[in-house]
Structures are given as C-alpha cells and as structure tokens.
Amino acid sequence: LFFALTISVIFSCNIEKSIYNNNVVSSPHPYASEAGKLIFSVGGNAFDAAVASAFTLAVVEPSMSGIGGRLQAIYMTSDGDISGVDAMTQIPESYTKSEGEENDSYGYKTIGIPGVVAGLLKLHEDHGKLDLETVMKPAIYVAENGFEILPGEIKRIKGEVEYFNDFESTKKYFLNSNSEPLKPGDKLIQKDLANVLKQISKNGNAGFYEGEVAQKIVQDIQANRGYITLSDLKNYEAIESDIISGDFNGYKV
C-alpha cells in the first residue's frame, strides 16, 4: 500500500490522470502488478503497463525475471492481429568450442547476450503511449527505496546459495553478513540496479547496450574469461517473432 500511495503521489504531480475501466494486470508479484495498474491510471496503454510490470518484476523477482536474461512476447493488437517479439539470448561472436571439449555449464563462459531490455524497449517503442521515463518510474522507485523480499524468492536463493557466494555482487545484495540468504520480510535495496534502470529510462537501448553500463558488463565478463564484447552488446537487436498458429478443437491457437 505504501508503494502504491507513494508512486501515485509522484505521478499526480506530473501527469494528468485518466481512468481506464477495462484492464487487468497479472504478474507473479504484487508490486509488479501494481506498477502496471499505476501506468494504466495515468493514461498508459496495455503495452506501457506490461513493460512497467516487467521492469518492476526484474527488481522484485531477479532470480526469475532479471534484465540479464531473455524475452519472448506474444500479443494481439486492437485490430485482432497476432504478433510478437523475439529477444532471446544470443551466443557471443567470439565464442569458440574445441572439438571434444565439454560444454561449460556454469560461470562467465556460459553468459549469452541479454535480450530482455531490447525486447521490452521494442514493445514500448512500437506500441507504447507514454514516455519511457514515466513507464519505468515504478521499477526505479522500488529498486532505489527497497521492498520486503517474499518467501518464494528466498526459497530460490536458498536452493542456489553456494553459487551466490561465488560472486561479490550477489553476496552484497542477496546474502547477509554471515553469507546466509536474506529472510522473508527483509528489505532489499538495489542502488546499482536503480542506476542501470535510470540509464535505460533516459537513453533507451544505448543506456544498457552501450556506454558506461555496457563497459562495466564487458569488463566484468572479460576479467572472468567470458566472451561478451562491446560489439556483441551494441549489435544486439530484438526482432519480430514468426508466430506459429494452428487449429485445436475449433479454436485458433
């Protein structure tokens, strides 16, 4: 409730509100759903709300929905057309695998070029109504001010706690001073993520796939024998999906 009231105050100071009666927002986390609802309340359309919810979900459910992953979206436009966006992770151009060499299954060498940001921005650019900074306000607010972490996220962290201990950044944010997982109800503040989201909200794809954020991503990956380069990030592009459809029991699927 506090999150909703605070964000509503921020919006009310800057944007003329509109009332939308025919909309539903569903997500795995109440804050992500609330973000979509708030975007509807200030005149956004379904794409604005979906993008706002997805970016907020990256903050509150990072183990499942972080901005370092991939995205596939399918949607129906107001005229009934079915389309989608393909923003899958891609293999870095410099990746090589010697004959007989086993595939890496863990660590920096397994990191592909992330597509979530490009995919969400394509959805917004092609179909959104509000400006990107407005759409991303809820996600930035939650990352910067924190939220009470839910049991489901804690359970996933506990299941992989040995991996969280392998990296300074995951230890910093998701483990306590004793290298143990946070507990349900603990407050999680992610200032670094908030800064990245701000760069994206102001500069679009260039705020993530180029510039300071991209340089830090590549520096970390290259220092740990990964493959992603600045060129890989800059050249990444989300594309329109080829939609496969068919008939089933009298319905088009």
What are these regions (language model features)?
Residues 1-10:
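Bacterial N-terminal signal peptides
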Residues 14-34, 38, 42-203, 208-210, ...:
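Noncatalytic scaffold domains of N-terminal-nucleophile
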